[in-house]
Amino acid sequence: MPPGSMSEARQSALKPGKLIRAQLTTQAGLDCIDFAARHHFQYILYDAGWYGAERSTTSDPLAAIPAIDLPKVIAYGKERGIGVILYVNYVGLRKKLDSILPLYKQWGVAGLKFGFVDGLTQHGIRWLADAIRKVNSYGFILDIHDNYKPTGLSRTFPSLLTQEGIRGDEHGPDAWHTTVLPYTRFLAGAADFTFCFPNAAGSFSKNLKVSKAQQLALTVIYYSPLQSMFWYGRPADYTNEDEIEFFKYVPTVWDETRYLAGDIGKNIAVARRQGDTWYLGCAAGMEDWDTVVKMDFLKPGRDYHITVYEDDGKGGIRRRMMTLRRGSRLPVRIRAKGGMAMICN
């Protein structure tokens, strides 16, 4: 067993899932925990700033700012089955990682997010490999952000659930970009896209260059055992439960994957299975997409109840139901920049 690796029992305790980012107060953490529990998420994240200015050498990742009662938030999360993930910038990691890990374990932290690491130089990559090993030995889950790209270390150290290394949703990518990524970046491994789904308060609406239904679909198309959802939103702003219902049910790890149709930079259709349930994500690039998907991956001899989430033509989500069987032909008609997500069970 490689140094820093873990037993199968400890590996099975690592929990993939979805997270929502909390604002930098105690109450925001508690509110996000309630939201996460209601929507079948597994984690909340305190991101940059929870221990002070992230790039300052005087900020201490061993102590939270006064606005956050971290023991209270972590304890409440345990009551509700929600883990707390903490962000630490590379400035703090380089100085204090060996102190951070035992302390966070004592606090009951579920995982870490590394920020602004050096994923380009030989020195930086060697440091990261050693840091990943250490995090893994403590049983934390790990998400590495910014320019680090997957190199296969998650095979040896399963605590490493995902990493950024991608121009994610925060940058407002267009539909050409979103339909190129499945054929390029995602060949290398998981990526945390930090979905910025708009809400009733208009968060990120001006920056979003694809439809809401495409955002739903991308959570199937894009593989990441840890998915960051609602990146710029607060729980109180998400008042339309019908629009975000799909996020409640979509898993982040899979038993089987089928790539059904697509053309790089133009469109993509992916089906993934967890247990007996299939999830489909279809996304169009900068042009309308009209095709037919054969449902040959479904189990024979039974009817599947299908829930479709698609664009309603007014900027929202429309939900409809149908029944399909193995071999059925599913028409896919998606407007440019749009998408369609499905649950088949």
Predicted segments with their positions:
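Aromatic- and carboxylate-enriched substrate-binding clefts and catalytic-loop regions
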Residues: 48-211
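Carbohydrate-binding surface patches
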Residues: 263-300, 340-341
